[in-house]
């Protein structure tokens, strides 16, 4: 078994979510309004009870509101928001409770199918609860019986959002304020997996019966070319094919096409649901065995086992007239069908680095 990319293991530092940042800055601004107290840092309690302290970049009054800001620290996670300035503006209001507003750089929901209603600011349920819990606790401590209006902003968020799946999900104008635990765990990719689930939900809610889950840009381009699918029906799954297959147990979209590079599809064929090289490897002896099943002689099998990459193995098989691409897709199809409900029609495409189709299975 060989990995096709080299990964370097090292201790990694956790960070804090945009939801934690919004909670800290909202609390600091509200405290300034109610008590006049201004601090360089603020403590918040995360959903599982851990108390963390977050440094503030500023906290001041501005007209009838207070605003406070902090720099998003995602630790060692490759988060698009790492280093961004997130700030909250808080106003007092007569009505009890907390009203949320999307400020500059925070998106608004424009399509049904997400956990938030159309027209709502893209501040997810757990961050909303974190902010509300902290502000209502502060109100109780201060003897304040009114409510709060909280506007969350992310500097440069509208441009940063173009690097996320928000536009495809129908979240327009900026980023989402996210988090379930309050902590960003490096390479846990929980936000990415959540966006995969959201993409499926949005496509299903909006009446699309055929979705294509793709590992990258080349496979997306292939699906556009083959099926002319709209953006909303293209699910950017990356390495997380398991996130797609398992979610279809809850949301059984009638037709699913899986499309990816030959190497990644060979991992799926071997039963892997995380296709990243950290978690699964190319099994060249298995590729040789599949080639043998469709006529490869001993010399070709040995050449496949000795290949440097799956692409080289595929090229060797192709030169010998052995349809290894189709055979790998067939095994991937069998595995995918074993995970999703029986009523979901599944098909699999494997492509080369240029987007050319090198194998397919389950295609009518």
Curated annotation (Swiss-Prot):
Keywords tagged on the record: Cobalamin biosynthesis, Methyltransferase, S-adenosyl-L-methionine, Transferase
Pfam families according to UniProt: CbiD
GO BP term, example: methylation
Annotated metabolic or biological route of this protein: Cofactor biosynthesis; adenosylcobalamin biosynthesis; cob(II)yrinate a,c-diamide from sirohydrochlorin (anaerobic route): step 6/10
EC numbers on record: 2.1.1.195
Reaction(s) this enzyme catalyzes, per UniProt: Co-precorrin-5B + S-adenosyl-L-methionine = Co-precorrin-6A + S-adenosyl-L-homocysteine
Molecular-function GO term, any one: cobalt-precorrin-5B C1-methyltransferase activity
Recorded family membership: Belongs to the CbiD family.
The protein, known as: Cobalt-precorrin-5B C(1)-methyltransferase
Organism: Pseudomonas entomophila (strain L48)
